[in-house]
């Protein structure tokens, strides 16, 4: 999939938008949505670090491609 030109809003993105991010597949996209739902939304992009499978390295690749 092509990378989006604008950062993706973590609080509004659907599974397809999240799956378009580098290093994020369908399972991780679902985990992001589950964490977002559980927390009532993300307050910071660093909240992605609470998602299973997203560590500092993966977050470093994503941080400029996402927003809240």
Predicted regions and their residues:
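Short, solvent-exposed mixed-charge patches
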Residues: 67-68
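N-terminal, intrinsically disordered low-complexity tails/presequences enriched in Lys/Ser/Pro
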Residues: 1-8
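Conserved hydrophobic/aromatic packing and binding residues within compact polymer-binding modules
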Residues: 32
